[in-house]
Amino acid sequence: MSAKGFKEWEVVCDALGSGRQSVIFRKGGIHEGRDGFSFAERAFFLFPTRFHHQAASVREGRVSEKPEWQVGEPVEIRYFAEAEWAVTLNDWERVVALEPYHILTEQVLRERFDWEGKGMKTSSIHVALVRVFRLAEPWTFPYEKKFGGCRSWIDLPEPPSDWKASLTPVIDQDAFQSIASETGQIIRGAR
């Protein structure tokens, strides 16, 4: 059985994996399908991407510009995520209020928020709160052409049989519950 991968900038995967980021924003890629993007999966591996100009798009984090993945190159999956909640925000002020929970620049978020594409109107963006877990050993497999393209969800090979037993949360339960409460208040507009 294959696993689902969520494509995200490598620097953001690192921020999620270190606990510096807890929310994921998405507008959708060109190849998201007729209805556009949705957080259709609630549990997924974080698949690090290397394209786009990541350094100018984040407020913090070490960015080493690398060329796009090449077929056959080893891909290293280090994190698994579970979405606690996912919503579409139409209120820019609520997007801005989530600033402590991610590393993206306001400009990048504004561009995504204002973009009108498949299934999404301007002045909206998808956001999900995710609980991230570190795999005890990175899961490595060769990059395939099917992983490319401007889309968020990809089918990955079958993961190692013992991967679930080795998961460690990157943020402890109490800290995550605090973040969940704080972000939930922002989403509901009860700041």
Show where each model-derived region lies.
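Structured alpha/beta reader/binder surfaces that contact nucleic acids or chromatin modification marks
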Residues: 2-191
